[in-house]
């Protein structure tokens, strides 16, 4: 298969491929899709950057919309993580901080930490939170970051500056 099928450039920017990050954390479907859209926003089709971010937000909102699905997804993800950590499966777990620094050129210690990075770090944190409420709050925080990113992109498109 060609690279547009197996390794499209909009997912392989930098050292880490998006799918490798997602597999290493066993994200549920909606969260994996949200991260995918955050990472590819503006890269697959520059004219659809806002649309990709809106899709990411839609997946995050859908994930927390149904409490039963939300709780079950968190439970199954935690069970998968425990199982695979006990069995050496050879899948590298890339930290959210390393992944976002690679994708967006940011660091935890810099003042210019993009909303996309914050959203991905919060989504990842939600999968490791000690309880459902903290997971929910992390996802709510990620939604706010995506909203802020959408505003920044619209400002840039409209030529507005803050």
Protein language model regions, located:
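Intrinsically disordered, low-complexity regulatory regions
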Residues: 1-162
């Amino acid at each position: 298969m060609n690279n547009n099928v197996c390794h499209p450039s909009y997912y392989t920017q930098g050292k880490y491929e998006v799918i490798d990050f997602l597999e290493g954390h066993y994200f549920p479907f909606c969260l994996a899709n949200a991260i995918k859209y955050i990472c590819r926003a503006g890269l697959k089709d520059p004219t659809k950057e806002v649309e990709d971010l809106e899709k990411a937000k839609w997946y995050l909102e859908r994930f927390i919309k149904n409490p039963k699905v939300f709780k079950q997804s968190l439970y199954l993800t935690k069970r998968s993580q425990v199982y695979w950590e006990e069995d050496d499966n050879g899948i590298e777990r890339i930290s959210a901080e390393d992944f976002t620094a690679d994708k967006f050129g940011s660091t935890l210690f810099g003042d210019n930490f993009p909303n996309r990075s914050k959203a991905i770090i919060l989504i990842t944190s939600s999968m490791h939170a000690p309880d459902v409420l903290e997971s929910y709050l992390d996802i709510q925080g990620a939604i706010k970051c995506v909203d802020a990113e959408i505003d920044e992109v619209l400002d840039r498109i409209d030529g507005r500056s803050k």
